[in-house]
Design a protein with these regions (language model features):
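Short alpha-helical segments used as structural interaction elements across diverse proteins
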Residues: 30-32, 48, 60, 256
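Bacterial N-terminal signal peptides
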Residues: 34-47
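Alpha-helical transmembrane segments and their juxtamembrane interfaces
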Residues: 16, 23-24, 43-45, 88, ...
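Basic/polar N-terminal segments that are highly enriched at the extreme N-terminus
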Residues: 7-13, 17-18, 48-60, 305-306
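Residue-level micro-sites within transmembrane alpha helices that shape
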Residues: 32-34, 50, 146
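N-terminal secretory signal peptides that target proteins for export/translocation
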Residues: 1-33
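Structural preference for beta-rich elements and adjacent junctions enriched in aromatics
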Residues: 53-306
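Intrinsically disordered, low-complexity segments enriched in proline/serine/threonine
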Residues: 17, 22-24, 29, 40, ...
Length: 306
């Protein structure tokens, strides 16, 4: 925020002129003086008052410190695997922003993260009454029409490239890349403006994550619900190309984590309710149009050898 410059002016001392007493009771002079005082107030006092007003609170975005791991996770979606106990944890996902409708309570969802130089590891632990998987393990299908977990990544942090990854409970993957051909312009909810989307936001559906590894498992819980674990290993060289790097290192990059769920109409086999959850809040159904709405991952340094 720029600091307003204060200019001090030293007025020359003027002789005191005595006015006739009758002048102060002249209505025209009284009105003129009142206007002068009001003008002084608007010119000098109001700017000071406005400067004293606190700045609007920034649209805070979440941050998470992610520990380095010497041991690679087994990528078997094993709920008892101990290495995940050392991971950074996002304990819950909140509902996406939907000003048109108040959604139900979010379903229990936890995200865990670890990193090595070659890989970013992500584990989703999702609980629900059941999971809708209309496209099975087909690649690049519309998996968002069923139950999925989603990852959005912007390793450079300038909102010019957005990588999207969706994974469903049967191992189906949808991977996309979005590219901006100009400086992003966002409106409400940090969603790209209509004009920008029409002109400068490009989707590359033909792009695929090379060497991506995914593992899933499902486990019945005592209350009748089901736990779904998705382990995802993201190769560093696939997300660091714009940096000119192939390995992760301590530092920051932008990310978001989401889950799509909702009740299904048995008659149609389609969703009768949309339950969209996210780590960093985005407009309902529009995370792929909100590259400036991501949170921040802070990759921590490895512990020195003992």
């Amino acid at each position: 925020m720029k600091t307003a410059e204060t200019t001090t002016m030293t007025a020359k001392k003027q002789p005191i002129l005595k006015q006739p007493r009758a002048l102060s009771s002249n209505p025209q002079m009284v009105f003129l003086r009142a206007r002068i005082f009001l003008l002084i107030g608007f010119t000098f006092i109001l700017p000071l008052l406005s400067r004293a007003e606190p700045e609007p609170a920034a649209d805070a975005r979440p941050r998470l410190a992610v520990p380095f791991t010497e041991t690679s996770p087994a990528l078997q979606a094993d709920p008892k695997e101990e290495i995940w106990q050392k991971a950074a944890i996002i304990p819950r996902l909140g509902l996406a922003i939907n000003p048109d409708k108040k959604g139900p309570e979010p379903l229990p969802t936890e995200v865990r993260l670890l990193w090595q130089a070659e890989t970013l590891y992500v584990r989703f632990i999702s609980v629900g009454p059941g999971f809708h998987v209309p496209y099975g393990n087909k690649h690049d299908a519309k998996h968002y029409e069923g139950d999925v977990v989603e990852i959005f990544l912007d390793p450079v942090g300038d909102a010019r490239q957005l990588i999207e990854l969706q994974v469903n409970p049967e191992g189906g993957v949808l991977d996309l890349m979005f590219l901006a051909t100009a400086t992003p312009q966002s409106g409400p909810y940090r969603m790209l403006t209509h004009e920008f989307l029409q002109r400068d936001w490009w989707t590359r559906q033909e792009w695929n994550f090379k060497e991506l590894r995914v593992a899933n498992s499902r486990h019945p819980l005592p209350d009748g619900s089901t736990q779904w674990i998705a382990d995802i290993a993201i190769p560093a060289k696939e997300i660091l190309r714009r940096r000119g790097q192939e390995k992760l290192s301590p530092g920051e990059f932008k990310a978001n984590f989401l889950r799509y769920a909702g009740a299904v109409d048995p008659a149609t086999g389609k969703r009768s309710e949309e339950l969209f959850m996210n780590w960093s809040p985005v407009r309902h159904g529009c995370p792929h149009l909100s590259p400036e709405a991501l949170g921040t991952l802070v990759l921590e340094k490895a512990d020195p050898p003992k």
